[in-house]
C-alpha cells in the first residue's frame, strides 16, 4: 500500500506541475466567484480541520521519540505533514472540478457518485469523532456528558450553518481572524518575542532540505496523513472550486502552495517554542484552542454537509429547514457514536 500511495502522490504532484506549465493561462472561475482573500479564507478553514489546532503538541512528542523521524526536527516534520507540498493535491482537484468535470461529468456516473458521497459522509463524521477523541487533552477532566454534549452541539451548529451559502463567508473569514488572534495571544503569552519566534521558525528550513522524504510514507502515521489529504482534497476540491474567481492555473498553484503555509508555519513555530522549552500551555489558552478548534470543526462539517446534501438531493428546499438540520444531525451523531462504541474503528 505504501508503494501505491507513493506512486499516486507522485502522479498527483506531477499532474499539478504539468497543469501549471502547459495550461498556465487557463482561468479558473467557479459557480460563486469570490474575492481572493475570501477564497483563501474559505480554502484555509474548510481545507483544514481541528487537527491543525489539536494535533501539533502530541505530534511533537511522537516525532521527538521515534527513530523513524530522527532525520529532522519535530517542527519540520509537522510542517511537512500539513504545509506546502500537500496543498498541491488541492490544486489538482480544484482545477479538475472547475475546468474538467463540467465537461467529463465523471462524478455523475452512479457508482462514482455514490462512492464519493459515502466517503464524504464517513469523513465528515470522522472529523467530528477526532474532535471528540482529542477534547480530553485540552479540557482536563471533562465529563463524558459535557464531551458528548459539546460534540453534538458542534454538529448541530454545522448543520444549521449549512442551510445558507452566506454563512460560508461569515464562518470562514471570522474563524480565520480568530485563528490569527490565537496565534498572537499564544505568542505574546509565551514571551518569546520576535527573536524567539524567528529562531523557532528556522527549524522549518529542514523541511525543504529533506523534502524528498515526504514523497513517500515515512511511517504508518504519516501514511494516515497522506490518505487523509488525498480523500480530503477530492472532497474539498469539489466544494472550493465553486468559489474561484478567475485565477490563472499558475497563480492558483502558487497561491495554494504559499498562502496557507504561512499561517501554518507561524502557528506551528509558536507551539514548538512551548514544546522545545518545556513550557506548559496555560488553561486559558487551552480553552481558546478548543474554541478555535470548534469553529474549524464547524467549518469542515459545514462544507462537507453542503457537498453531500447537494449531491444526493437532500437540500433545504426539498426537506425544509427543520427536517434538513435534524436529518444531518442524526446522521453525523449516529456515525460518531458508531466510531466510538463499535468495532468500526479507524487506526491512525
Predicted regions and their residues:
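Helix-loop-helix connectors at the membrane interface of multi-pass transporters/channels
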Residues: 113-116, 127-148, 239-262, 304-329
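Membrane-interface loop-to-helix entry segments
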Residues: 106-122, 162-186, 257, 346-348
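N-terminal alpha-helical transmembrane segments of multi-pass membrane transport
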Residues: 1-69
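Hydrophobic transmembrane alpha-helices that form the core helical bundles
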Residues: 49-69, 83-104, 110-140, 201, ...
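Hydrophobic alpha-helical segments and their helix-loop junctions in multi-pass secondary transporters
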Residues: 12-22, 51, 123-140, 146-147, ...
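Membrane-water interface regions at transmembrane-helix termini and the short interhelical loops
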Residues: 1, 16-32, 73-75, 94-109, ...
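Loop-to-transmembrane helix boundary motifs in multi-pass membrane proteins
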Residues: 146-152, 223-231, 250-282, 286-291, ...
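Transmembrane alpha-helical segments of multi-pass small-molecule transport proteins
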Residues: 5-14, 83-91, 112-125, 139-164, ...
